[in-house]
Curated annotation (Swiss-Prot):
Annotated PANTHER family: MANNOSE-BINDING PROTEIN C, PULMONARY SURFACTANT-ASSOCIATED PROTEIN A
Gene3D superfamilies per record: Mannose-Binding Protein A, subunit A
Gene: MBL2
Function summary: Calcium-dependent lectin involved in innate immune defense. Binds mannose, fucose and N-acetylglucosamine on different microorganisms and activates the lectin complement pathway. Binds to late apoptotic cells, as well as to apoptotic blebs and to necrotic cells, but not to early apoptotic cells, facilitating their uptake by macrophages.
Protein name listed in UniProt: Mannose-binding protein C
Gene Ontology BP, a term: complement activation, classical pathway
Region described as Disordered: 43-113
Organism: Chlorocebus aethiops (Green monkey)
GO MF annotation terms: D-mannose binding
Record flagged with keyword Secreted: yes
CDD domains (alphabetical): CLECT_collectin_like (cd03591)
One Pfam family cited in the UniProt record for this chain: Lectin_C
Length: 248
């Protein structure tokens, strides 16, 4: 057997192998399409890293699907600030008079009667022991001696006023009550020689002693009821019996 054909085939194989390392598969097909074949593809490499996120796209149109059910209500929010008060409503109609049991009504009447009886008894006791009543006035003394200003304060404390006789009957009642000379609610402190009561009204009744008022010492601005029932002007700072009158 001849070795030439075998040697020729071996040389062609070597040349094809060395040439395929520098020539691309495409070029090799052009050069030697009938003799040299391309190698098979290699194994795929590892995936590359993800690229950066792109810019946000525009909002798309609503889908064509059915609208979902309404979700549950959210939590209650904090209470708001209190509102301003509204305007007052119209006045309601007068109600019907109430009804009280007959027993309560009769009890109240009996209690009032008992209270009135007790007050009358106390008034009689005061009149007998400490005071005198004339008409709708009740004259009362505590037996203490003090200045005119203190007498005014004492009477005002008991919602009374300094005794001021308006007629002879009241003057006589005071005279019979006192055992000492007492202040009257009369003065000329505002205008010398013009005696008025403590409300500023001019006197409609007087009972001055002979030669009075004389303003001795130029400081006699108050009036004293003497034991004989006559009046005398004296200094307001002197101390005399406190005498008050109470309206009844």
């Amino acid at each position: 057997m001849s070795l030439f054909p075998s040697l020729t085939l071996l040389l062609l194989s070597v040349v094809a192998t060395s040439y395929s390392e520098t020539v691309t598969c495409e070029d090799s097909q052009k050069i030697c399409p009938a003799v040299i074949a391309c190698n098979s593809p290699g194994i795929n490499g590892f995936p590359g890293k993800d690229g950066r996120d792109g810019t946000k796209g525009e909002k798309g149109e609503p889908g064509q699907g059915l609208r979902g059910l309404q979700g549950p209500p959210g939590k209650l929010g904090p209470p708001g600030n209190p509102g301003s008060s509204g305007s007052p409503g119209p006045k309601g109609q007068k109600g019907d008079p109430g009804e009280s049991p007959d027993g309560d009504s009769s009890l109240a009447a009996s209690e009032r009667k008992a209270l009135q009886t007790e007050m009358a008894r106390i008034k009689k006791w005061l009149t007998f022991s400490l005071g005198r009543q004339v008409g709708n006035k009740f004259f009362l003394t505590n037996g203490e001696m003090m200045s005119f200003d203190k007498v005014k304060a004492l009477c005002a404390k008991f919602q009374a006023s300094v005794a001021t006789p308006r007629n002879a009957a009241e003057n006589r009642a005071i005279q019979n009550l006192i055992k000492e000379e007492a202040f009257l609610g009369i003065t000329d402190e505002n205008t010398e020689g013009e005696f008025v009561d403590l409300t500023g009204n001019k006197l409609t009744y007087t009972n001055w002693n002979n030669g009075e008022p004389n303003n001795a010492g130029s400081n006699e601005d108050c009036v004293l009821l003497l034991k004989n029932g006559k009046w005398n002007d004296i200094p307001c700072s002197s101390s005399h019996l406190a005498l008050c009158e109470f309206p009844i």
